[in-house]
From Swiss-Prot:
GO terms for molecular function: ATP binding; tRNA binding; tRNA-uridine 2-sulfurtransferase activity. The active site is at 97 (nucleophile), 196 (cysteine persulfide intermediate). Residues 146-148, 301-302 are annotated as: Interaction with tRNA. This is tRNA-specific 2-thiouridylase MnmA. Disulfide bonds join 97-196. Belongs to the MnmA/TRMU family.
Amino acid sequence: MSDLPAVVVGLSGGVDSSVAIASLKAQGHPVVGLTLWLMKGKGQCCSEGLVDAARLCEQLGVPHHIVDSREIFEKYIVNYLISGYANGVTPLPCSQCNRLVKFGPMLAYSREQLGIDYIATGHYAQVKYNPTSDRYELWRAVDRHKDQSYFLYDLPQEILAHVLFPLGQQTKAETRALAAQYGLPTASKPESQDLCLIEAHGSMRQFLDQYLPRQQGEIVDVYGRVLGYHQGIHHYTIGQRKGLGIAAPEPLYVVALDREHNRVIVGDRATAGRRECTVARVNWVSIPPPKEPMTATVQIRYRTPPVPVTIIPDANAEQVQLEFAEPQFGVTPGQAAVWYAGDRLLGGGIIQPFGTPTLHPLEATATHV
């Protein structure tokens, strides 16, 4: 009998989670597969993924459990998205899903139903215990291109203490090679490129149009000139350039969403830059909440490079002010700002709305162009 602890492995039916469970089994861990049934209706992640995960566990000769998580997914993700877009922000569902739908409920199910204290997933990230601070630290994956620590910033210490990331120290190419070596049926399965909701509904716009009414409004520049019309501010996000449906002599970007007046405000790239923003719902991961300002690097979107920042915490550090060394393009309310010291994730939170910019009409310019 193995001395290694038993692990419940979250399975999506993809190659990453398949290699995670196969690798842990090869190391000698007793393993159990667990798949969350997330979405109502038909869709890849609520049908094909379940079938592929079940087949994988049958091939590996390990138990497979399916947990019906459709209600909590609807409550914490679908409703969260709809509410956010309706209020003119661009929510980040993945970090909220990881905390409230996946990791938390997975660990609870593992302990309460199976008596197992550890869970694992196919995420590319690393957890390291620091005995000096007595904290479980979250670090970037070795494969920087695949690193998913940004989406995991909201996981609390009580979860990080009981989670394993078997893929954190290998590249995606090595994962594919292991899948072939293990003879896994998912070895050649193409990688998912979109949110599960987008895969199921075709696009975020199609998904949102099922819930939010189309309401025509103006697209204006920072001088208040009407450049065109939109069919709903939920179709737009800060920093967006493509798909604006307007003609202009220079590239224009969404710089603000004015929910009160149902307007999309556009400007040039310089207008879209911001030197600071407020971040709330902060989770301090690898360090305790600081009492004084500190410097770090920050990512304001998943694929944006980290940039220097000064972090100014409030009294209890549950909210911070970020001051960027240089103006940053695409700072978007609703998205996560996640700060690092090198590859160590320090903390993160949600970028807050920063008010509608004051428009400055040009007296000698016609209202419409």
